[in-house]
Amino acid sequence: MSRVCQLTGTRANNGMSVSHSHIRTKKLQQANLQQRRLWWEEENKWINIRVTTRALKTIQKKGLGKYAKSLGVDLNKL
């Protein structure tokens, strides 16, 4: 399974690791992904989904159905 948030589409960021002597090497900054079982209120069922912690925070605030709708994601396909 790829390291991509199923709601927001967030993926790894290419960056540089800079040492004390200023030598740069490439590094991947991975998204903080968590596998979660979330309750979908509108359909009265559980959904297993891989989301970032930032998306989880927004889901707690808005709700899973409203947040997915605002992003244009169809939860029935997940």
Swiss-Prot record:
Protein name per UniProt: Large ribosomal subunit protein bL28
Alphabetized PANTHER family for the sequence: 39S RIBOSOMAL PROTEIN L28, MITOCHONDRIAL, LARGE RIBOSOMAL SUBUNIT PROTEIN BL28M
Organism annotation: Prochlorococcus marinus (strain NATL2A)
HAMAP family reported for this sequence: Ribosomal_bL28
Pfam families: Ribosomal_L28
Signal peptide (residue range): none
One GO-annotated biological process of the protein: translation
Keyword Ribosomal protein (UniProt): yes
Annotated segments matching region Disordered: 1-23
Highest classification ranks of the organism: Bacteria, Bacillati, Cyanobacteriota, Cyanophyceae, Synechococcales
GO MF: structural constituent of ribosome
Keywords: Ribonucleoprotein, Ribosomal protein
A GO cellular-component term linked to this record: ribosome
UniProt record similarity statement: Belongs to the bacterial ribosomal protein bL28 family.
Gene of this entry: rpmB
Bias (Polar residues) ranges: 1-20
Gene3D superfamilies in alphabetical order: Ribosomal protein L28/L24
